[in-house]
Amino acid sequence: KPILFINKIDKKDYILIDTAGMRKKGKVYENIEKYSLLRSMRAIDRSDICLLVINREEGIIEHDKHIAGYAKDSGKGLIIVVNKWDTVEDKNNDIKDFTKKIRNEFQFVPYAPVVFLSALTKARIHTLMPQVEKVEENIVKEIKTSLLNNCIMEAYDLNPAPSYKGK
């Protein structure tokens, strides 16, 4: 069963669900991996915002993409969190290079912010909550109908429907 944490930050309650981490192939049996993935999917169903934690030492694994895709398909907010940043020596170049790799591997969620931190040393952990608040604002943001209609018309003008026999 996932572990639940209730945090109160700036007078807001946040319920954090910690699911079992995914592992690279060969480290666990396949059926355990599938069960772990199903638990993560159930946790996503119960969430508003998902924090996809990537282990910097292991890098991006296939399950990370499945989880991100499921969060996207479920209409959930998503933040990609790169943990174990304390183990990286060239931090400035690593942020740039690994963010580029994330953007390449997760092209289907270009809107998801990327946060680098270390849970162990608490380095850059202060950068996470502002991103959670920003994603939360975007989830509840309402778009005016006129703006949405204009956007749809622009898209239609750029890609009009094919005509049938010139009509």
Protein language model annotation of sequence segments:
Residues 1-17, 21, 27-38, 42, ...:
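C-terminal-of-GTPase-core extension/linker across diverse P-loop GTPases
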